[in-house]
Amino acid sequence: MKRKASIMFVHQDKYEEYKQRHDDIWPEMAEALKAHGAHHYSIFLDEETGRLFAYLEIEDEEKWRKMADTEVCQRWWKSMAPLMKTNSDFSPVAIDLKEVFYLD
């Protein structure tokens, strides 16, 4: 498994809605994430800044990249766009983080 982490940004007046949408994640979205090799996916919120810290483990980088091309992912991004900073394709603005320490 490969560990991945990134920072995303949620609008400060949208925290509750962001959390609720993830509490009620579409079953087909959860299935697609798993089918594309996602495990142990967690998102944490810094309420002072609106920064989201996302962590997940993936089986394979290429398999994971294909998730972005799925119809359900495209719909999810579009539905989440009003809540977050996004790119022109509605994908979340995300900063990939470099792992500098790991203790098993």
From Swiss-Prot:
GO CC annotation terms, alphabetical: cytoplasm
EC no. given is: 5.1.3.32
Record-linked Pfam families: rhaM (PF05336)
| MF terms in GO | L-rhamnose mutarotase activity; racemase and epimerase activity, acting on carbohydrates and derivatives
Question: Which reaction(s) does its UniProt entry say it catalyses?
Answer: alpha-L-rhamnose = beta-L-rhamnose
Keyword Transmembrane helix part of the UniProt annotation = no
Any idea which residues are catalytic in this one?
22 (proton donor)
Q: In which pathway does it act?
A: Carbohydrate metabolism; L-rhamnose metabolism
> Where is it located?
Cytoplasm
InterPro entries registered for this protein in UniProt: Dimeric_a/b-barrel, L-rhamnose_mutarotase, Rham/fucose_mutarotase
Q: Say which domain of life the source belongs to.
A: Bacteria
Keywords, ordered alphabetically: Carbohydrate metabolism, Cytoplasm, Isomerase, Rhamnose metabolism
Q: Does the keyword tRNA-binding apply?
A: no
Q: Which residues form the signal peptide?
A: none
The top EC class is isomerase
Q: Which residues bind substrate?
A: 18, 41, 76-77
Q: Extract the coiled-coil ranges from the record.
A: none
What the protein does? Answer: Involved in the anomeric conversion of L-rhamnose.
PANTHER family in UniProt: L-RHAMNOSE MUTAROTASE (PTHR34389:SF2)
Quaternary assembly: Homodimer.
Which family is this protein grouped under? Belongs to the rhamnose mutarotase family.
Report the protein name in the record: L-rhamnose mutarotase
Q: Which organism is it from?
A: Bacillus subtilis (strain 168)
Q: Which gene encodes it?
A: rhaM
